[in-house]
Design a protein with these regions (language model features):
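Hydrophobic transmembrane alpha-helices and their immediate loop junctions
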Residues: 1-186
Length: 186
C-alpha cells in the first residue's frame, strides 16, 4: 500500500477544519469502500499488486487485465458496501451521520463518469451488450454529458447561494474524465 504526501496533507487539512467530527467517518467509509473492492477481487482470485491512495482518490494496481464480468463485479463491490452500511447505520441510534456519509459516497461513486465505479460499471455493461468499441464510445459520451450537467448545476448553485463545492467536484471530475480518456488512448 502506498499513501501519497498529497493525501496526508489533504487529510490533515480536512481534519483540522472538521468541527462536526465527520471526517473520521468519511475516512472510514472510504476505507471500507476500497476494502469492498479488494475483497471482491480476492474472492475472484485476482492478485492485487498495490493500493495507492492519493489526494484525488484510490487506485488499485492489478497484475493483469480483468475481464468485463470480473471488473463489473469488482466495481460494484465498493458502492455496495457503502449502501449496505448506510441502510444498517440508519437503524442504529446515533448512526444517522455515518449512514449519510456512506449513502453519499456510495451514490457518488455510482455516477456514470470515467474512473468512478459507475463509469466502470457502465463501460463493462455496454461492452458486454454492444461490444467494447461502441461501449467505450457511449460510456465516454455519457461521462462528458454527466460532467457537463454537474458543472452547470455547480455554476447554478454557486450563483444562487455562493457555495462552490459542487462546481469544484465537477471540475475535478472533468479532469478525471480527461485523464481517463488519455490513458485509454481516446
Amino acid at each position: 500500500m502506498e499513501v501519497s504526501a498529497g493525501f496526508l496533507l489533504l487529510a490533515a487539512w480536512l481534519n483540522y477544519w472538521d468541527r462536526q467530527g465527520v471526517f473520521p467517518r468519511v475516512l472510514l467509509a472510504c476505507t471500507l469502500h476500497e476494502l469492498g473492492h479488494l475483497l471482491a477481487l480476492r474472492w475472484m482470485g485476482v492478485p492485487v499488486e498495490k493500493l495507492r491512495v492519493t489526494a484525488v482518490g484510490a487506485e488499485l494496481r492489478l497484475s493483469g487485465a480483468l475481464g468485463y464480468r470480473t471488473e463489473l463485479a469488482a466495481a460494484m463491490a465498493g458502492p455496495a458496501v457503502n449502501l449496505v452500511l448506510a441502510g444498517w447505520l440508519s437503524h442504529i441510534p446515533g448512526g444517522v451521520v455515518g449512514a449519510g456519509v456512506n449513502l453519499v459516497l456510495g451514490l457518488f461513486n455510482l455516477l456514470p463518469i470515467g474512473r468512478l465505479d459507475g463509469g466502470r460499471i457502465l463501460s463493462c455493461v455496454l461492452a458486454l451488450a454492444i461490444g467494447p468499441e461502441y461501449g467505450e464510445r457511449v460510456a465516454a459520451l455519457l461521462s462528458v454529458l454527466c460532467v457537463a450537467l454537474l458543472s452547470a448545476a455547480g455554476i447554478w448553485v454557486l450563483w444562487l447561494g455562493g457555495n462552490g463545492s459542487l462546481l469544484m467536484v465537477s471540475l475535478w471530475l472533468a479532469v478525471s474524465v480527461s485523464e481517463f480518456g488519455r490513458k485509454r488512448g481516446k
